[in-house]
Amino acid sequence: FPBGZFTMZGCPZCKLKZBKYFSKLGAPIYZCMGCCFSRAYPTPARSKKTMLVPKNITSZATCCVAKAFTKATVMGBARVZNHTZCHCSTCYYHKS
């Protein structure tokens, strides 16, 4: 895959999708959804030696996140991000 990105079968690409829950309350609200790159591989021995808690498997991933967004108010006073552009980048929410 020359550009480093690929699509997995059954998993849509990272793109804007309308949020049906918030959109039914007025103007459409969009959020980034879809798949990006991820892989897992055995942890190299030299890396294991530097880990506080050695792990046998190392994983790498990027997540579908907003590259740009605007703030919107829904349900009277709830502030949400209305995504306007998506890309695959650092995963902000993950288990440690």
From Swiss-Prot:
Shared alpha chain of the active heterodimeric glycoprotein hormones thyrotropin/thyroid stimulating hormone/TSH, lutropin/luteinizing hormone/LH and follitropin/follicle stimulating hormone/FSH. These hormones bind specific receptors on target cells that in turn activate downstream signaling pathways. Glycans are attached at residues 56, 82. GO terms for molecular function: follicle-stimulating hormone activity. Coiled coil: none annotated. It comes from the Eukaryota. InterPro entries: Cystine-knot_cytokine, Glyco_hormone. Disulfide bonds join 11-35, 14-64, 32-86, 36-88, 63-91. PANTHER family: GLYCOPROTEIN HORMONE ALPHA CHAIN, GLYCOPROTEIN HORMONES ALPHA CHAIN. It comes from Balaenoptera acutorostrata. The keyword Glycoprotein applies. Belongs to the glycoprotein hormones subunit alpha family. The keyword 4Fe-4S does not apply. This is Glycoprotein hormones alpha chain. GO terms for cellular component: extracellular space; follicle-stimulating hormone complex. Pfam families: Hormone_6. It is found in: Secreted. Keywords: Disulfide bond, Glycoprotein, Hormone, Secreted. SMART domains: GHA. The lineage of its organism: Eukaryota, Metazoa, Chordata, Craniata, Vertebrata. Heterodimer. The active hormones thyrotropin, lutropin and follitropin are heterodimers composed of CGA, a common alpha chain described here and a unique beta chain which confers their biological specificity to the hormones: TSHB for thyrotropin, LHB for lutropin and FSHB for follitropin. GO terms for biological process: G protein-coupled receptor signaling pathway; positive regulation of steroid biosynthetic process; regulation of signaling receptor activity; thyroid hormone generation.
